[in-house]
Design a protein with these regions (language model features):
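An acidic/histidine-cluster motif and surrounding catalytic segment
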Residues: 1-104, 115-146
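Conserved ATP-binding N-box helix of the HATPase_c
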Residues: 112
Length: 146
């Protein structure tokens, strides 16, 4: 079973839990994971910048950070995904994409990172983008809000 808890900074209006859970559950099951305990935390730029600096020694804004809490060779997944809602909105404008689709993509992206996918090279980025596009086609992300 894929268990997902969602925490939201109270200054934001968050996406529908059911759609977020559908996206992440679909990624996990499609990638062969039947047991997962995930925490999705939706916050702001400062939260993610602090995490990026503290854990990676990099001082800049980012839209998503994922931490796998157990070993990658384990069949179950325990992890946390942090998303900056303002950064997702800015990136949606930058990439001329709807906010809902960009948020769906970032949720999927975080899930893929928990599974060991990396975006540190051009080829790895392309592989992740293919997976993101595939899963965006398969799940109804269009109603993340409202």
């Amino acid at each position: 079973m894929v268990n997902i808890d969602i925490e939201l900074d109270p200054k934001f209006y968050g996406p529908k839990d059911s759609i977020v859970c559908s996206l992440l559950s679909h990624v996990m099951v499609s990638e062969g994971i039947s047991q997962a305990d995930l925490l999705l935390i939706i916050g702001d730029d400062d939260l993610l910048a602090d995490l990026k600096n503290k854990f990676f020694g990099i001082n800049h804004y980012t839209d998503v950070i994922a931490f796998r809490l157990n070993e990658y060779h384990k069949k179950n997944v325990e992890g946390e995904i942090y998303i900056s809602l303002p950064r997702v909105k800015e990136n949606a404008n930058k990439f001329e994409e709807s906010f809902h689709k960009e948020l769906g993509r970032i949720i999927i992206h975080g899930g893929l990172h928990l599974l060991g996918y990396k975006d540190d090279t051009k080829n790895n980025k392309l592989e992740m983008e293919k997976k993101e596009n595939l899963y965006l086609e398969q799940v109804n992300w269009g109603k993340l809000y409202g």
